[in-house]
Structure formats: C-alpha cells, structure tokens
Curated annotation (Swiss-Prot):
It comes from Mycobacterium leprae (strain TN). This is Imidazole glycerol phosphate synthase subunit HisF. SUPFAM superfamilies: Ribulose-phoshate binding barrel. One of its GO terms (biological process) is L-histidine biosynthetic process. Belongs to the HisA/HisF family. Pathway: Amino-acid biosynthesis; L-histidine biosynthesis; L-histidine from 5-phospho-alpha-D-ribose 1-diphosphate: step 5/9.
Amino acid sequence: MYSGNGLAVRVIPCLDVYCGRVVKGVNFKNLRDAGDLVELAAAYDAEGADELAFLDVTASSSGRATMLEVVRCTAEQVFIPLMVGGGVRTVADVDVLLRAGADKVAVNTAAIARPELLADMAGQFGSQCIVLSVDARTVPTGSARTPSGWEATTHGGYRGTGIDAVEWAARGADLGVGEILLNSMDADGTKAGFDLAMLRAVRAAVTVPVIASGGAGAIEHFVPAVTAGADAVLAASVFHFRELTIGQVKDAMAAAGIAVR
C-alpha cells in the first residue's frame, strides 16, 4: 500500500521548540524539556526519519520572530527535508526561512486572518514549499458554521475561529498549498491515537498530501492513520523519550503492507 499520492509513507519526528529547546507537553501546555534541537535532529536523520518538523509553539501567541538561527544550524548538519512553522506571517518570513535552509514552511494563524496569503506564498515559492497547518478541535455537531464537527484554531490551539476545519483544509488546497498538516488539538500529547474520523474527512476533501499529527502513543496507532488517509505520520514525545524508534514504526507499517522508505 502506498500513500494517497502514490508515494511511500513518510515518518516525521516533530520538534516543538520553546526558547531554542525541544519541549513536549499535552495540548501545548505543561511543556517539559526533551533535548537539544540540533542534536535531536541529527539523531533522527541518522535513524532514518524521512523529514523533520520544527514548530515554534510560542511564536504565534507571543509575536516572537521565527527561529532562523536554529534552522541554519540544523540545515548544516542534517540532509533530510525540514518543515518549519510558528510565527510565519508574511511572504518575507517564508523567504528568509527557505534561505536559512527550510524546505517547507507551515502557516496557520496568519492564513486564517488573510487566506489569500496562501496563494501569494504558493505563487512565489511553489506549492511544494507551502504547508497549511490546521490545528483542529472537536466542537458540538449541528453548527451551521462548523458542519464537520471540527473547528480550526489558532495561537497554538488557544483561540477558536468558528471556521470548519475540513472546509478550511479544502480551501487551503484550492489556494495552492502543497500539503496539509492536520493536528488534532484534542489528541495532541495524549498518546491515545490519531483522530481517524477527522483524517478520513479531510482526506475525502483534498487531493494534496495529508500529514497526520496529534495523539501518537503506541506502535498500533500508525497503521490505522495511514489506512484512514494519511500520507505521512508525525509524532513527537514517543520519539523524543525513546518510547518508539523510527525503525520500529517503519517496520510495523511495512509488515502491514504499507510502502515506506
């Protein structure tokens, strides 16, 4: 089995960054230190990660500048694609991140405020460089504004938008983004498994690749995410604290007939 776009499924460690250190909490709260960012990134590169995600978990809410120096240092030592997000507000922000060594840039809060920003970014740098990060949480069903039952949030999940998360993912794809980073704020950090229903809904709404994020806690969680429609699986604490390795996840997927690199 290949991903929805016919490619091998990617395994992506996510490095949530606070003040230059890798941290992981539950729902972006109660953050605890998980290690030096560049050191971890190099270890994941050697271990066989297909890509790395750097997410500044404070940038959007505190207005801090994006972590250019961290990206530069990491890009000098690792040779797999780097996706960077957090605090990206303008086309110029994307430009400096790509010049610093990022391969893809993830956008969330700024795009909610000005959706046409996605088209501007994709038009200037190419769809393959722009990822729409959708931090979605469950809301009561029956709402006319959020018919899918999931709402897009901003500022690390602290602010609701009233925008339907599935519809927002589809709009982002229409505006030219090359990928959707779909993060369940309900599942994030809980290790209870990915939100499979949300994955299926977004997979049915878009043709671009979808990265499943939020909830990975056991080896049994990854194969269902792929069968639900994920083209890539992203996890943080299970990798940082050595509860699982990249190799174990790839072996489990390969045993289930899923193509991995």
